[in-house]
Structure formats: structure tokens, C-alpha cells
Amino acid sequence: MFFGDKVFLENDKAVELYEYAKSLPIFDYHCHLAPQDILGDKVFLNLTELWLNGDHYKWRIMRAYGVDEKFITGDGDDKEKFFRFAEALPHFIGNPVYHWAHLELKKYFDLTLPICPKNAEEIWTRTLEKMADGSFSAKKLIEGSNVCAVVTTDDPVDDLSAHRAIAREDNPFKVLPCFRADRLINIDKPDYADYVKKLGEVAGVEIKGFNELLEAVERRLDFFVANGATAVDIGMEDFPFGYGDVSQCDDILEDRLDEKFIDDDDKAEFQFTLMAHIAKMLRDRDMVMQLHVGVIRNCNTALFDRCGVDVGGDSVANVLNVNNARDFLDYVEQNGGLPKTIIYTLNPTAYYPLATLIGDFQGTAY
């Protein structure tokens, strides 16, 4: 049988561990599900709606195979989009998407057919029949997957109206926001001044300097906490270097708000300092700091201009600068202490140095 019950389980101990863990509830503390879709209990009626309309990992596979963008993010027919995906997938054995897709086909549709052009029609038809009754909706899928909590990814300026509405419902799971601070720290981005203005408006703070920025961040963080948030998440290419005092960060922020150029040293100093202050805010609130390190966003400008963000145009960055990581963690630890911290790296070559580094900060007083 293709993708049988023991796929990936290579010995008896693996089976024993899986049997022990398979029925445990899932706490998904980092995902990109849209809270609006959960609130509206969005119904998925075919595999393209369920799999392809928002999964940029699958889009990368299709682009690599040469599929026209019309059948990836464009206005192509849903069935034809799935057929193009089924044509591409067999060429990517070893890619996690290959395994994910077949595991999902088995778990949710009880189908063990290989996804390929030969089986595309049967897979499409049989899944279509199973989805026709509306049972493949956002809430039913979450509940049916034994998920107890979903933590979404939300910008500090978001109003969290969907989260508040979901919280008023009687669901067997929680949907909590997470304070995603990328746009706060990315001072070099062209729209940063506009973003800071928006942040000030929603926080009720006129941001003219670094202290006002910190006040706005703190107000928005408290707003998130009031709506169930327990964590902040920051994605970055690498750890910044060099703490700056408030006056230095004032000058850097003032230049940026005036649309002036800032160099890499200014950027790093500003990011380091802002992140250190955010870390203290988190510790004071008993929150978790999540750091996603090692990603370069929107590498393909033409693709970004056509399709926007999170469409499959991101890449793995160079090896982690462990010295910078050490300096940041050590500075925060010496100045009030680290909050609970999770560090992810997208570059597998960085796992070993990062694992040894975080071991240096385990067991500190909390």
C-alpha cells in the first residue's frame, strides 16, 4: 500500500511512541491561518480551495516545474490548477510537500493513491464528493484535527475584531493572537514612516521619537494581551548587533521618519535596542518571545510586484551570526533577564551552533 499506516515509522519503538502521542491534543502556537476564515467558518468545496489557494510551498513546486502563474495564483480553473499540481508533485519526492500532501489525503479522505496525472481525475472526483456536504469547514477541520488552541500571526496595528468575536463563541478550541513585530523593527523598509504613523494612530500616541515609539508598542502589546495574546514573534534575516541609547535611536528614527537614508549600522543599532526593550516588556508580562531567524523576504521583486508578500518568494539566509545572537541574548539577560524564548532557524546549518548557544542560557532564574 502506498503511504500505509507505518509510513516513517521504521521500528517497533517508533510505532510505540507514535501510538502514545497520536491522540494528544495539538496546541498550534505558530500558524498563518486567517482568523476571519475561522470566524466565518469558511467552507472548502474542492482541493484547490483547501490546498492551493493559499499555500506558497505548493506554489514554489509548481513554479519550479514550469507551471504558468495563471494556474498558481491566477484566475485559472480550480480543477485545472489541481491537475497542474498533480503533474508537478511526482517530480519532488523528498520535498516535505510531497509527504504532507499524501498524509493529508490519507488522513482526511482515506485515499492512498499517489498524487500524479494518472490518478488526478479519481482523486479530484472522490474528494469533491466527500467535501460536498460542507463538512470541510475551518472550524470542523480544527476540531476534527484535535486542535485545542490556534495562535495566529497578527500585526501590531490589527484591531483583532475577529479574535474578539471568536472568543464570544462557544468553540471547543481557542484562537489567540500573536504580536508579529517584523514591521516594527524593519526600519529600512520604504513604508516604515507610514507604518509608524498608523501605529501611532491606533495606539493613541503621536510618535516623534524613540520613547513615544516604545509607548505605542507597549500600549498595543497590552491590547493584544487583553485579547488573549501570550507571545510576540519577530522574523529577521539575522540577529542585529550593537545596543544604542535613546538619544541615538531618536536620531535614527527621526531620520527615517523624514525619509532620510540610514546605513546598516544604524539599522542594526535601532533593531537591537527596540528588540531588547520588547524583550523586557515580554518578561514583565510573563510572555514568550519567538524569534524566526534566517529568512530573506521577497527576493524576487517582479514576483512581489505581481503577487505581493507570502507567495513563495522568500529564501534561506546565510549562516547565523552566533556572535550577534550571543550579544543580544546576553545583553537582555543582563538587563532584566530573558523572557521565555523560542528561536527558530530556517537554515539547517545553523542548528548546531544555535543549539549550543541557547544551552548557555538555559535554567536562568525566571
What are these model-predicted stretches?
Residues F328-Q334:
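Short, basic/hydrophobic alpha-helical segments
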Residues V295, N300:
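Hard-cation-handling environments
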Residues V288:
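Residue-level detector of anion-binding/catalytic polar loops
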Residues D314-R326, L346-L354:
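A general structural motif
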